[in-house]
Amino acid sequence: MADIKALVEELSKLTVLEAAELAKALEEEWGVSAAAAVAVAGPAGGGDAAAPAEEKDEFDVILTGDGGKKIQVIKEVRAITGLGLTEAKGLVEGAPKPIKEGVNKAEAEEIKGKIEAAGGTVELK
């Protein structure tokens, strides 16, 4: 164990150039490639691509635009979020921006309906 710690300390002292040279020398000595090790690992996750997606239970409500009715959308954003006029205006003008995050499906659909009724466009993620 002490040998490993000493080796780690010595390797930590190497410059980037020296570390690259070391990697190349080890690749040649052992007949391996660092890039090949990554390719062999394969994709992460390992889930079945054909498996049905689980239904989400939390959504982010993203304002994507004001639809030309900025004032009505700002009023609705203020009512939904409790933000002040300046903050709500900044949110609407800075779209796409999240209005609410981590809400249940029913609340997300309700918010979407209110914003769309005011003239805005919304995306649920």
UniProtKB/Swiss-Prot annotation:
Which residues pair up as cystines? none
Q: Name one GO biological process term.
A: translation
InterPro entries for this protein: Ribosomal_bL12 (IPR000206), Ribosomal_bL12_C (IPR013823), Ribosomal_bL12_C/ClpS-like (IPR014719), Ribosomal_bL12_oligo (IPR008932), Ribosomal_bL12_oligo_N_sf (IPR036235)
GO MF terms here are: mRNA binding; structural constituent of ribosome
Highest taxon above the source species: Bacteria
UniProt KW keywords: Ribonucleoprotein, Ribosomal protein
Q: Which GO terms describe its cellular component?
A: cytosolic large ribosomal subunit
Give the UniProt family note.
Answer: Belongs to the bacterial ribosomal protein bL12 family.
Q: What does this protein do?
A: Forms part of the ribosomal stalk which helps the ribosome interact with GTP-bound translation factors. Is thus essential for accurate translation.
Q: How does it assemble?
A: Homodimer. Part of the ribosomal stalk of the 50S ribosomal subunit. Forms a multimeric L10(L12)X complex, where L10 forms an elongated spine to which 2 to 4 L12 dimers bind in a sequential fashion. Binds GTP-bound translation factors.
NCBIfam families in the cross-refs: L12
UniProt name for this protein: Large ribosomal subunit protein bL12
- Provide the organism lineage as a comma list: Bacteria, Pseudomonadati, Pseudomonadota, Alphaproteobacteria, Sphingomonadales
Q: Which gene encodes it?
A: rplL
